[in-house]
């Protein structure tokens, strides 16, 4: 719950206040439990990475956007959708934790709306994504101007180039064995929906299957 609320607040700072993610994320990570810091990073980076696609999905489900003081709840919905589309967090947990975060953000009156939007997406995800993905820049997560330039320069390979550009290099992290065993750390990451495996390069080495950032 707190992790989703912090993710929405970080995204608001980046999009509405023009702050850099690298500048605001560390302070937010200090406000959540150590075991949730990697998840917070994944939610922030991932939501911003796929912002146009997530925004398009919201626009398919809502007639009127959330504005002004309610804008933070738009970002919370984006965080919820990111979990449903791009992570292996169980859908029921992703929805419940995101909806519960509404209370922390002091928007209890919007709880029903946010719950409805996320559950609507659960029911109709295939149709919604099929509709918005007709626009290549949305489907492939690139700005429209860059998509046009790539299509003009690489007539037959532009989609392959954009798909390759979305791939992230492997990310390795080091477990602090003085605090917990590597197996315990892997178990905590699995509970948070972060897929990782033990690395062969060292006793404390962990490889993230879905890098953050």
Q: Which role does the model predict for each range below?
A:
Residues 1-213:
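Class I Rossmann-like S-adenosyl-L-methionine
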């Amino acid at each position: 719950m707190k992790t989703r609320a912090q993710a929405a607040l970080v995204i608001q700072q980046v999009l509405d206040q023009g702050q850099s993610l690298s500048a605001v994320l560390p302070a937010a990570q200090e406000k959540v439990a150590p075991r949730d810091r990697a998840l917070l990073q994944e939610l922030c980076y991932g939501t911003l990475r796929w912002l146009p696609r997530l925004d398009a999905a919201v626009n398919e489900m809502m007639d009127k956007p959330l504005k002004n003081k309610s804008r933070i709840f738009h970002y919370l919905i984006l965080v919820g959708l990111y979990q449903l589309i791009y992570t292996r967090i169980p859908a029921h947990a992703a929805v419940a934790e995101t909806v519960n975060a509404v209370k922390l953000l002091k928007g209890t009156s919007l709880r029903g709306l946010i719950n409805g939007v996320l559950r609507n997406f659960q029911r109709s995800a295939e149709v919604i994504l099929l509709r918005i993905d007709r626009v290549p820049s949305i489907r492939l997560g690139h700005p429209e101007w860059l998509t046009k330039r790539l299509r003009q320069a690489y007539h037959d390979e532009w989609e392959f180039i954009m798909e390759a550009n979305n791939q992230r290099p492997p990310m390795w992290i080091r477990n602090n064995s003085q605090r917990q065993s590597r197996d315990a750390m892997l178990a905590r990451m699995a509970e948070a929906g972060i897929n990782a495996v033990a690395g062969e390069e060292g006793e404390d080495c962990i490889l993230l299957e879905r890098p953050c950032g």
